[in-house]
Amino acid sequence: FDGCSGLKQVIFPNTLKEIGDYAFRSCPELITAVLPQGVEQLGKYAFAGSGLKTILIPHSVYWIGEGAYADCKRLNHVTVPDNIVSIPDRMFSGCDSLSEIKLPETADRIGSGVFENCSSLQSIVIPESVRSIGENAFGETHPKFTLLCHRLSEAERYARNHNITFQIIY
């Protein structure tokens, strides 16, 4: 369905286990794609450039490919389930309407460019479990952007090294 400009909705069977690489990339009218419990993998750029506004990734997903939701211009709310430990490179890059995201408390890695060009994102809580943050993970941050992080965490170190405004949380 890559590049299917008229696709508006997808209903997946409950038996679906994997969404392939580029499966729904560049489907700008796709605003509804409810992933069933049982889906385990989301391929690279699977929904990149789609019209999705909100995503809820099922707890059954254990692997997400690079850029899975990149350039989703309407996307504004995301919840990533606790079983995802690595937020892949460029997962949400270019999602300029993204204003709210909940990262799992179990995340240990935030990839490169994950939140690059997410101009509506004003703050993000970085779990204490994060041990690695990739280059340009937050791109060019705007003046009101704040990383909410734990004292002496990797996120605090990253914020200091990249001149990103941060606030210590407990």
Predicted feature descriptions by range:
Residues N161-N163:
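Short, structured coil segments at secondary-structure junctions
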Residues D2, G20-R25, G43-A46, G65-A68, ...:
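Consensus positions within tandem repeat domains that build extended binding/scaffold surfaces
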Residues C4-E18, P28-Q41, S50-W63, K73-S86, ...:
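Structural signature of tandem-repeat unit edges
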